[in-house]
Structure formats: structure tokens, C-alpha cells
């Protein structure tokens, strides 16, 4: 039987020890984890193969099976990512926002770890190391709860991590995993606020909703949302098409992939056939409003395009597949209103008008807003953060890609010369 109280106590104790470590000690531990993953890859891959075999027997969709799968190349990449985290600047201990007050008090903020992070994720065994490495570098202990379909993979990987931590002189309990498939344990973890300081869910809408509805621990919500690109008549059409193809096709299952394409009416008759032909080459299904459908149905070559009329629900749908909704708008105001209703994750405008670009960036409320760039850039690695634990759509604590700095908080430090308050 899993004793969550004991797991929480051990994590809290480990967090206190981690907060005192030097950057060199943390980096050495991360490199030891990377070495351990490669040295013990046979054990990890065997555990993963058993998980994958069960998933295939159970009829799990191929896309999810592929997400579950670890190979020597993928494991080497995970180890490389761990080393990359070791090479990143350490945010812990950073001094900022210095000021001296009229009272003589010298005041500043020092960046400190959050404490204990709970991570709940689905069929993504790579997340085990991704989150553990980032939490450790930021001085946090972490309690991992992977999906039951990757339980063996998580157990084997966590065992390797714990051994590496011990060898590096760190508490082995700095990274713990809950392997029991009982979902009630997830509910209990979400309410373990005596020990856990933050919950990060990584998965679908159902998981995020479950966490928000059941947690007393603060939850970072993210990784979901409808992403838009709005094309203006002033855009360079020839250069805009590859941006849209990249946003939709490069990784359609990603949360920052394009879902809805908004095209200004003055650009539609010229631009839509260009982008439809390009997307069709990649097998993208085009779900069009009536006006867009009429334009495309009359365009040369439309027989080869997968055109379908859009339903009202398509414009609020995160497809996570080779599907895009297309809507014609009469103005930037209409585009902004549409994005305000359905968007909030990754939003972009393709335009040659700096006034429109400035207005778009000021008025769109999203985790990231781009001008003449793909929505796929909304990513910790692309932002130069090294890696991320999630893309937060929260407004409080962190928003957008959560890297090392977002896994810390700060303490006010006040220094005086035996000062008393007047």
C-alpha cells in the first residue's frame, strides 16, 4: 500500500537539503543521471517494451504507442537533454530588485526553490527525466505520477535516477514516483498541501480538469488551447504559406500547432488557394466556413484538396491532428474578437502593416503572441530556456513555457544596522 504521507515527508526533507546545494553539486548529479540512463538502458528499455506490448494488445492507438515508446536513440536524446539542463545557468540564489529605503533598510529579493513539485502525466515516459532534471536544477524535490500504461518505464527510470542521486551525494528521495495505478492516489496527491507546493499536470483536457477540480495544492494549467494565425492583405503571401504549413504540419499533436486559420476577406480569393494546395500536399483536412469553402471549391486543383464544411464546434477545437479550421474575417477587429472567444495559447499575425502588428500584440490575450512567425515557436527550447516542464496558460505565478526560473520563487531580504521601525 502506498503511504503518500511518508512520500510527502521524505520529499519535504529532501527539498530542504536540495535548497542548500551548490550549482556544481546539482550539475554533477544531473550528469550522473545522464550516465546512469545510458549505463542501465537495457533495464529501462526492457521495462518500456513490456509497457508498449501491453498497450498494443489493448488496442491503444498507434500515435499514443509511439509516444510511449523508448528506443536507444530516444533514451540517448533524453540523457542529452539532462546534460543540457546541467549546462543552463542556475537561477537559485540570484539577487535582484535591490533598493535602499529612506529608513536605511537595504532590501533585495533572492531567488529560491519552490519546494516540492508534484508532476502528474500520461503516456510520456520521457517526461520522467525532463521534469526531474529541471526540478533538481532549480532545487526542488519532485513526486512523479506517470500514467498506469507506462508504470514499468517510470519505475525503472526513477530507480536509475535515485541511484545516481545517491552516488552524487544527494538525497535519493529527491525524486520519487507513485507506481500504484489506483486513481484515488492521484486525488490524494492533489490534496497533499502539507508537503506539496505545486502540481504540474502533463496530459489531456480530462487530466487538467480532474486536477483543477480536486486539488487543494496550486495547479499549473497548460498545454491545451486553440492556436490561431490571422493573415492580413498586406502579408507576403509567398512567405506566409510556409509559416502556416510549419505551424500545422511539423508536429500536429503539439499544443502549439495551428488549429484555426483566419484570413482577411480582401486576401481570401488569392491567398486561400495557395495555402490550401500547400496543406493538401501534407494530407491536411480543411474545415472551412461557407465563404472559404465557396472560394476553394472554385479554385483550380480543388479536387485534390480535402475540403469539408466546418461545424460550429470546429472553431473552438484543439485538433491535435492534421486538421485545420478556416474562417474568413472582415477586419482585424473581427479576428481579435474571434481569438478572444476561442484562443489564449499561441497566436500569430502575418502582416506587412506595423500598426496591425502592434495592435495584435497589445490586444491578444495569450501565453505567447507572434508577428510573422509560426506558433510552433512557443516552446521552452525555442525561447532559449533550455527546456520546460509545461506551457502554462495560468495568469498567476507563471505564464507560457515554464523553464528553470519559473520553478523558483523569491524571498525578500532586508538588511539594516540594528534598525527599528519608526
Curated annotation (Swiss-Prot):
Localization per Swiss-Prot or TrEMBL: Cytoplasm
GO molecular function ontology, one term from the record: NADP binding
InterPro entries, sorted: Ald_DH/histidinol_DH, Ald_DH_C, Ald_DH_N, Aldehyde_DH_dom, G-glutamylP_reductase_CS, Glu-5-SA_DH, GPR_dom
EC number per UniProt: 1.2.1.41
Presence of the UniProt keyword 4Fe-4S in the record: no
Alphabetical keyword list: Amino-acid biosynthesis, Cytoplasm, NADP, Oxidoreductase, Proline biosynthesis
Family annotation (HAMAP family): ProA (MF_00412)
Family of the protein in this entry: Belongs to the gamma-glutamyl phosphate reductase family.
Summary of the function given for this chain in its UniProt record: Catalyzes the NADPH-dependent reduction of L-glutamate 5-phosphate into L-glutamate 5-semialdehyde and phosphate. The product spontaneously undergoes cyclization to form 1-pyrroline-5-carboxylate.
Protein known as: Gamma-glutamyl phosphate reductase
The gene coding this protein: proA
